[in-house]
Amino acid sequence: MLWVGLACHFIGFDTLFMQSWRIREPVMWLTEYLTGNRKTYGMNKVGGVARDLPSDYKERILPVVEKIETETLAAVDAILGDSSLQSRLAGTGIITPEDARAFCVLGPTARGSGVDIDARRDHPFAAYDEVEFEVCVEQGCDIWARTLVRIRETIEAIKILRQLLDKMPGGPVMAEFDEIPPYKVGVSSVEAPRGEVHHYAMTGP
């Protein structure tokens, strides 16, 4: 909803911009409840997470998910039903599949040009190999197609969240490991909101 709201603001659709922020706000409350912060969560640590989730996390999350899903679908209908919005975005900002590959375009921008790539599926990390989700690809190659990808991914994220809540395991939140030897290398690739993010790390002496 952050992206949807900002996109609407940039093109002058401020009514939906404000509605998107309203829909998003309960998510911010939830993240503050679960992590202690609205934005910079500080939960990830080497070997696990900083603290366990509260015991009632499912009871707190599910009603918010239900509400957000309903309101998001209504916002999507408003976007898809706005002919002036479509006329401004369709046919604008063309990136052909060939250009997308030539310029190494990634993420939703690539998928809006018909390039079927997604690190969550192609190089599974975290628990993505344990959930079902659709890689959202559009063939329009324009801003409208990229907008549709973002919209579809917002709905898909809600479906993923439901699965993760059902499959959340118990147990310790930090892995136990001995002293890590020096000069060991780790490489990761994850699907971020704007495309793949790669990290390279090496242990010190």
Model features per residue range: what roles?
Residues M1-P205:
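Active-site bordering "gate/hinge" segments
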